[in-house]
Amino acid sequence: MKFGRLILANLFRKKARLVLTIGSFAVALFLFALLGVVNDAFSRGADVVSADRLVTINRTSIINTIPLSYRDEILRIPGVKYITHDNWFGGVYQDPKNFFPQFVIDPENQRQVFPELIVPDDQWNTFLKDRQGAIVGAVTMKRFGWKIGDRIPIKTTIYGLQDRSFEFNIDGVYHGAKPEDDESQFWFQWEYFKESVPDRFKGQVGWYTIRIANPDDAPRIAKTIDNMYLNSPYETKTETESAFAQGWVKQFGNIKFLIMSIGTVVFFTLLLVTGNTMAISVRERTNELGVLKAIGFPDRAVLGFILGESIAIALAGCVGLLFALAAIPALSRAMAGLLPPLLVTAKTLAYGVIAALVVGFASGILPAYGAMRMRVVTALRRV
C-alpha cells in the first residue's frame, strides 16, 4: 500500500486504544465463529442426511413405541429397499454426566440402511456372533479411552430396569464417511435387549428407518405406510430423514433466530464502539489532516487514510477467528455427547472476515468522509 507506513504510524500513536479496539473485534469475531459453528451443528443433521431415507415413528410421540410386526409389512411396499429398526436405550456409563447416545439396532440391516457409517467387515462379523457385542463411534471411543475387546457396563434408566447393569463387549469401531457424520453413537444387538426387558417391550421398537430405491417416491411411500396403520392402536408418522431431523432441532426452539439476534447485537455494538474510536482519532488529528491537505494531499487520499486505518483494525481483529479455530475443536471434545461435533468450516471463517471488513468500512466511512470534506483553513486553526 502506497501510504501503508503512514497508516501504521497513525494506528500506533495510541497503543492502548489500538489494543482495546482490536480486542473488541477479536472477541466479536470469536463469538461470531462460535455462534456460526453451533448453528451449523444443529442444522447439520438436516443437511447431511440421505435423500433416500424415511423415518417412521409413532404418531403420538417418538417416545411411544410401534410394533416390530410392521417391519415385514413395510418392506413389501413397492420402492422400499431396506428397513431397520432402533430403540433408544437411555443408559448411563459411570456418571450421568457421561452422556452419549446408545441405540438398540437391527444388526442384519443396519449397514444397508446407513452405508456412510463404516465398520470393517471383520469387526462387524465378530459383532454379529457376539450376543453382548457393541459397535462404538470413534469419537466416543476416544473420549473414554476405550479399545476393542474392552468390557463396558452401562446402566439403563428406562424400560422398568432402573439400575440394571448391562455388560457389553466392544467388538468394533465405526467411522463416518464425512467429517460431519455423527461418530458418538453406541450400538448393540436387538436380541440381547429383547431377552432382558419386560414382556411388554419385547415386540416393540422405537422407530423404523427405511431406505428407498428412488427419493422421488418418498411422498408416495410415506403416505402408503401411514395409511396402512390409520385408525390402528399404533398409528404412524412417516417423513423424510431431513424433515425428521429438522423437527428434532425445532424442539430446542428457534436456534437460528436466537443466534442471529445475538450476532446482530454483538456487531451493532462493535460498530458503535469502532465508529466512536475512529471519530475520536480523527478529531485528535484535525490539525495534522489540515497540514496534509495544505501540502498537496488530495481529499481522496485523506479518505483512504482513515478508511485504511479502520479496515486495518478490523483485519487485525481476525485473530479472534484464529483463536476460534484453535479453541472450538477442544470445546467440541469437551462437549462430546452433549452437542453434535463442532466444526469450524472455511465458509464460517470467510463469513467472519467479510463481516469484519463490512464493520471496519461502516465504522470508518463517516469519520473518513468528514475528514475528506474538512476545509484546510478550519483544520489549521488548531496549529
What spans do the regions from the language model cover?
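Hydrophobic, regular-secondary-structure patches
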Residues: 26-103, 107-109, 119-130, 142-143, ...
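Hydrophobic alpha-helical transmembrane segments of multi-pass inner-membrane transport and secretion
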Residues: 15-40, 252-288, 311-319, 359-362
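Basic-flanked hydrophobic alpha-helices used for secretion and membrane insertion
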Residues: 139, 146-239
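C-terminal membrane-exit region of the final transmembrane helix in multipass inner-membrane proteins
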Residues: 348-383
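Peri-transmembrane interface segments
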Residues: 38, 42, 217-271, 281-283, ...
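Hydrophobic alpha-helical transmembrane segments
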Residues: 4, 18-22, 322, 346-354
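Short helix-to-coil transition segments within interhelical loops
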Residues: 11-12, 282, 291-300, 374, ...
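Transmembrane alpha-helical interface segments in multi-pass membrane proteins
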Residues: 279, 287-332, 351, 355, ...
